[in-house]
Structure formats: structure tokens, C-alpha cells
A protein has these predicted regions:
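Non-catalytic, glycine-rich low-complexity segments
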Residues: 4-13, 21-32, 40-86, 145-164
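Extended acidic/polar, glycine-enriched regions
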Residues: 80-160, 170, 176-186, 194, ...
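Short, glycine/acidic-enriched loop or turn micro-motifs at the edges of active sites
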Residues: 169, 205, 372, 446-447
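Alpha-amylase-like alpha-glycosidases and glucanotransferases acting on alpha-linked glucans and related
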Residues: 210-352, 356, 373-614, 620-622, ...
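Residue-level marker for buried hydrophobic side chains located in beta-strands
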Residues: 364-366, 440-441
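Ligand-binding beta-strand-loop-alpha-helix segment within the catalytic cores
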Residues: 369
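Structured C-terminal cap/extension of enzyme domains
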Residues: 624-675
Length: 675
């Protein structure tokens, strides 16, 4: 790789080397670097192109007086300007409430070029918020967004406990084959009555309403809006006010429940038919108010849903004039599909109403899960295509478990376009997921710092890291979480740079402490008293074995049957048995597991004994379910995201049975000791 290409890559945040999972340096291929730069609209395909791009880098800041956006955290900031030397200059900050504050500091000249000067001026003390800087230079006014954010988020003052749930798996006797928002309300109400302070739920992001639905909550169509699959139709005001005959007709659409699988497609099809019966009774005023509140973002999503019903997915296969939200055919489409778009706005209103108020009187409340990205053919990718690197996907480099790397198939944010947009798209995302939330868990929180970009047509190992302005993204999170009164949790498992955890901790973002991963350098389990306090503690996650599954080696058996081990069954069994023996020995040494005691209870006792601010248990662990919700590396070979919660024998349980299970009551009594 030439020094010039390396210089260009560094300037755009594209890595030319990185440390792998074993902490060994890896050189990125020039082809991967060139591809990543191309995804940022930087031509680096030739020596001449690289030189031209370097010149452009040097000239670009001098073309406009103000930067695209200014972010200030934890105190007064400084503003950089590029103006004509000697020109009259007036600076003001326009506050988000309309007030104005003059910037009357003395500018300091840092550089000069071709009759222009690079100035830096100190900003006055400003209130937190989304403001605007206005610069009037020689009578011409330009502006840029200004974000003033707190330096640190507030973390829970008292330790608290709760449950982490896969909602779709918790089916009640009243739900239509899939755990729904009424079931979530039941979980929250039960947990609150027991003294719990938090409930973490899997991502509730919206799917594209075209069958078959993608069962993975981590590959959504939209992270800005929420899934209608979770609606309890009988809990809508439209149903409550309907005549008995219509209510009977709606209830008669309930599909039979498959005892062994969570089948979203028949459930959603039935709910859609039921909602269409109720649509003529929708509350016109409430819908108009909801549409006014959420504006263009909701209208674009609703239109996308209507168009997808007609043209299918992905949107890249739609008629060309409809492939952009500002395309030449969109105005006519809004007229032609106005009724159906209004219907999809109403569906989001119903979802919003059923999630409102959940957990608001708990110490933390309902914690939503934010997926790392969206389906390239879905609603957000269509509406936000200008700030996404379409054609590139997010994944992970090779490691000891995935020697070919991983490609998650999700297009990443473009860091340059986010900055140019003043981080407004990210603000909208954060505000959306914080609506009716006491907290947010950010999946793969390392993505605030960098993401592994895989070029189109390349293998997952043939990518490179692209960096983001983590301080700016954390500033957005900090301000919006402060305003929502919410806690932020980062999923920081696996290989994580030391600076990432330090930065997150300094910002008040809680980490994740998972029992399986809390080990020292030689792999020995750490006693819970040694875990970091600023974390959410759990035994496992959706991608890992359950407590009972780990003890029974169920994950080994399943991966062996599916040819997912990568080495011999005996080797894996020996490794897992060593891990289990070490874990049980640690629990015994800490006085958490007596001879003949229940190791699953002891694992939960370890969570209680830790200093972690939030401690969460899983209903699957409490009832003895052997099966993990998702088996990474599989698609159709394993029923990912389609398993109802079951007991140790594999018999599916209803939500009512789960809450009455003796194991749930025993673990609840243990967790109530969290202080």
C-alpha cells in the first residue's frame, strides 16, 4: 500500500491495519481500502485519483465559513471558521427556543491561505440543546447545527434487578401465536409487583409488511418504528367500541397456535385482516394528531409499507421513479396510496398506545434493544439511503469462532453523511427508540466507534474497519437520554478495544457483564465481586447457551449435529467440561454453591453478589429451557427466533405457566436480595 493511499485512508477513517482477536496486527489489503473509500465517494482507484483526493481534503474546509456541525460536551466549546481575511464577521447562537446569544469572543487566527484565514473563537456558556450557529461574513449569513450535550449520562443510583425477555416466545393464552404487547404489559406488571426495577425486551423494530416476515428482530425493516406483529387487536379502542358482531368477527380470525414454533406469518396475516375490519372505525382526530406529531418520517414509512404491498421487496426492484422518497413518482404515489398510507400510520398509533406507560413507575423501566442496523431492502434503507453506504454491509473480521469472518448483511451509516446532516438521522433514531422507554441497550456498541465494512461481492474477511465520531454520537445519546430520563447500556462483549470501554464508562454508558465471559486472562471465571459495577449483569444472551443448556451441553450437541463445531466433538466436549468445572468450582469457592445445590440458582446468586448496577435474569433460565433463542452461523438449519419458551423436557409453556413456575418464584426471591 502506498503512503499516499494510507494517508488518504486515515483522513477518512478507513483502517489500513487492525489488531485481530489474538491481538496480532493484520494488514488490510489495498483493494479493501479502495473499496471502503469508494463507498464514501472517494476515488482511490489510481495514483492520480489518490493525489486529487488528497488535494480535495486540503481545500474542502476553506470553501464554507462554518463546519457541517459543531458538537460541544461538558463545557464551553470552540468554533472554527474559514473566512475572507479582513471581512466583517458577526457570530450568534440561535437557541432551540428561539433566543439569541452573541458570540463576542476574540477570534484567534490559526492559518492563512489565498486571502482567507482560519479562525477559532471561544463560545459562551450555553444551555444543553440542539441550537444553531449563525455566521454573517461581509453581509452574507450561513449557519450550522450546534449540539450542546452533557459530558456524562446519569446511571442508576441504586442497584436494581429485573428480567430480560424474548417477547415473541412468551405467548399467553390470549395472544395470537406470538407474544404480544399485552403479554409484555403482563410481564412488566408482574415484575413490578415483585419489586423489580427493569425489564429488557428484544428489539421491537418494524418489519416490512410483506410475507414471509424475517423472524430476526436484529434485521429489521425500520428501527424508527415498531412492529405491528406485537399488537393485541382486542386491546385497541376501535375493537372496544365495535358492535358485538364485529368483535366476534375479529376474534374469529385468531389463527391456531403451533405448540412448538412461533409462527409470525399466520399471526400477522390474521392481525392485518382484523385491523382492516376495524379501520373504518379509526379515531380520525387521534390519527391526525399522531401524524402531525411524527411528521415526514412517519409519512415516509407508511408510504413505504403501502408501496411494498404493491411492489414487493426489496425496494431496489421497484419502478425506478419510486426508488427514492423524493423520486419523480413519489408525489403521485402519495395521492394514489393515501388511504393505505393512512392505514399504516394508524397501525403505528395503535402500537404506540399499547407500549405507552409500560414500566414508567419502575426504577429503570422498560429497556428497549437497538439493533446494529437495518435490512438493505427495507424502509429505513429506502428513506435514509443518502446517509447509508448501500452496497456495503456490516460484519466482523475473522476470529477463533468464525475463521471466515461474519457478514451481517446490514448497510452501515456513512460517517461523512451523518456529519453533513448534523447527526439529525441519528437523533431521530435515538428519539424513536427512547419513546416509551426507561432505557436502551445498544447492540454491538462498538459500532459507535468503528464498524467492519464488507465490500459488495467480497468475502467477510476481505473488509476493513471504518471509524465514526464516537464523541459526537455519544453526545447525541447523552442529550436525548437525559431528556427521556433513560439509562443507556452498551453490549460490549467479545473483542473490544480498551479505549472503547474507558470512553463508554466516562460517558456513563453501562457495559454488559455476562457470566460466561467474566474471566481472567487464562480463562478462569472471575468471582462476581470482581465484576465492574458500571454494567448490566446476566448469565447469558440470546446468542449463547441457556444456563440449563450449558450444564447439559445442549449447545455442543446441536452444533455437532449441524456441523457447526469446526473441530472434533471430543475436543469441544473437553473444552466445555473444563469451563463448567471451573465455573462450578468458582461458585463453590465463593460460597454460592453447596454440595448437591442447584447450580442454576448459584449462577443467579453470582449476579446478586456482583456490584453491577442492573441484574437481569431470563425466564428461559428460570424454567430450565435447554435451547438458546439464536444459534449464530445458522439460518434455516436451526429455528432461530422461533422457539417458544419451554421447560426442561421441551414442553412449551404459556406465559401464565411461566409466571407460576416454581423456578421463577425461587429466582425472584433470590433477586429480591439485590441491594
Amino acid at each position: 500500500m502506498t503512503p499516499a493511499l494510507a494517508q488518504l485512508a486515515a483522513a477518512h477513517g478507513v483502517a489500513t491495519t487492525y489488531q485481530d482477536w489474538a491481538d496480532s496486527p493484520v494488514r488490510v489489503s489495498p483493494a479493501a481500502v479502495v473499496a471502503a473509500l469508494a463507498a464514501l465517494d472517494v476515488d482511490a482507484a489510481s495514483t492520480e485519483a489518490v493525489q486529487a483526493a488528497l488535494v480535495e481534503l486540503e481545500l474542502a474546509p476553506w470553501r464554507t465559513p462554518l463546519p457541517p456541525v459543531l458538537v460541544v460536551r461538558g463545557g464551553p466549546g470552540r468554533l472554527d471558521l474559514h473566512v475572507e481575511q479582513g471581512a466583517a464577521l458577526v457570530l450568534e447562537v440561535v437557541l432551540e427556543d428561539g433566543g439569541r446569544i452573541p458570540v463576542d469572543g476574540v477570534p484567534v487566527a490559526l492559518d492563512r491561505r489565498d486571502g482567507q484565514v482560519h479562525l477559532q473563537v471561544a463560545l459562551p456558556d450555553l444551555p444543553l440543546g440542539w441550537h444553531t450557529v449563525e455566521a454573517t461574513v461581509a453581509g452574507t449569513t450561513t449557519s450550522c447545527p450546534l449540539l450542546v450535550a452533557p459530558e456524562r449520562l446519569a446511571v442508576p443510583e441504586q442497584r436494581t434487578w429485573g428480567w430480560q425477555v424474548q417477547l415473541y416466545a412468551l405467548r399467553s393464552e390470549q395472544s395470537w401465536g406470538v407474544g404480544d404487547y399485552a403479554d409484555l404489559r403482563t410481564v412488566v406488571t408482574s415484575a413490578r409487583a415483585d419489586g423489580a426495577g427493569a425489564v429488557l425486551v428484544n428489539p421491537l423494530h418494524a418489519e416490512t409488511p410483506v410475507l414471509p416476515l424475517n423472524p430476526s428482530p436484529y434485521s429489521p425493516s425500520s428501527r424508527l418504528w415498531r412492529s405491528p406483529v406485537g399488537l393485541r387487536v382486542e386491546d385497541t379502542l376501535e375493537y372496544a367500541g365495535a358492535p358485538a358482531e364485529l368483535q366476534q368477527q375479529v376474534s374469529g380470525l385468531r389463527p391456531p397456535t403451533d405448540p412448538d414454533r412461533v409462527l409470525r406469518d399466520p399471526s400477522f396475516a390474521a392481525k392485518l385482516a382484523a385491523l382492516e375490519l376495524l379501520w373504518p372505525r379509526h379515531r380520525v382526530g387521534a390519527l391526525a394528531q399522531f401524524r402531525h406529531l411524527h411528521g415526514g418520517g412517519l409519512e415516509d414509512f407508511a408510504l413505504f409499507c403501502a408501496l411494498a404491498e404493491v411492489h414487493g421487496t426489496p425496494w431496489q426492484d421497484w419502478p425506478e421513479q419510486l426508488r427514492r422518497p423524493d423520486g419523480p413518482g413519489i408525489a403521485a404515489a402519495r395521492v394514489a396510496h393515501a388511504e393505505r398510507a393512512a392505514f399504516w400510520c394508524w397501525v403505528q398509533l395503535l402500537v404506540d398506545e399499547q407500549l405507552a406507560g409500560l414500566g414508567e413507575d419502575m426504577a429503570v423501566g422498560l429497556v428497549h434493544d437497538l439493533a446494529v442496523g437495518v435490512d438493505a431492502g427495507g424502509a429505513d434503507a429506502w428513506a435514509l439511503q443518502d446517509v447509508l453506504a448501500l452496497g456495503t454491509t456490516v460484519g466482523a473480521p475473522p476470529d477463533s469462532f468464525n475463521q471466515q469472518g461474519q457478514d451481517w448483511g446490514l448497510p452501515p451509516w456513512r460517517p461523512d453523511r451523518l456529519r453533513a446532516a448534523g447527526y439529525a438521522p441519528y437523533r431521530a433514531l435515538v428519539r424513536g427508540v427512547l419513546r416509551h422507554a426507561g432505557g436502551v441497550r445498544i447492540d454491538h456498541v462498538m459500532g459507535l466507534f468503528r464498524l467492519w465494512w464488507v465490500p459488495e461481492g467480497a468475502g467477510a474477511a476481505e473488509g476493513t474497519y471504518v471509524s465514526y465520531d464516537a464523541q459526537a454520537l455519544l453526545a447525541v445519546l447523552a442529550l436525548e437520554a437525559l431528556r427521556a430520563g433513560a439509562v443507556i447500556v452498551g453490549e460490549d462483549l467479545g473483542t473490544v478495544e480498551a479505549r472503547v470501554r474507558t470512553t463508554l464508562d466516562d460517558a456513563g454508558v453501562l457495559g454488559s457483564a455476562v457470566l460466561w465471559f467474566e474471566t481472567d486472562d487464562d480463562g478462569s471465571p472471575l468471582p462476581p465481586r470482581s465484576w465492574r459495577p458500571a454494567a448490566l449483569a446476566s448469565i447469558t444472551t440470546h446468542d449463547l447457551p441457556t444456563a440449563a443448556g450449558f450444564l447439559a451441553e445442549e449447545h455442543v450437541r446441536v452444533r455437532h449435529e449441524l456441523d457447526q463445531l469446526g473441530h472434533s466433538l471430543q475436543t469441544e466436549q473437553e473444552r466445555v467440561r473444563t469451563e463448567r468445572e471451573r465455573l462450578l468450582a468458582m461458585l463453590g469457592a465463593e460460597g454460592l454453591l453447596s454440595e448437591g445445590g442447584d447450580p442454576v440458582l448459584a449462577m443467579h446468586a453470582a449476579l446478586v453478589a456482583s456490584p453491577c448496577r442492573i441484574v437481569l435474569a431470563s425466564y428461559a433460565d428460570a424454567v430450565g429451557d435447554l435451547r438458546q433463542p439464536n444459534l449464530p452461523g445458522t439460518v434455516e438449519q436451526y429455528p432461530n427466533w422461533r422457539l417458544p419458551v419451554a421447560d426442561a423436557s421441551g414442553t412449551p409453556l404459556t406465559l401464565e405457566q411461566v409466571l407460576a413456575c416454581p423456578g421463577v418464584r425461587r429466582i425472584t426471591a433470590l433477586l429480591q436480595q439485590v441491594r
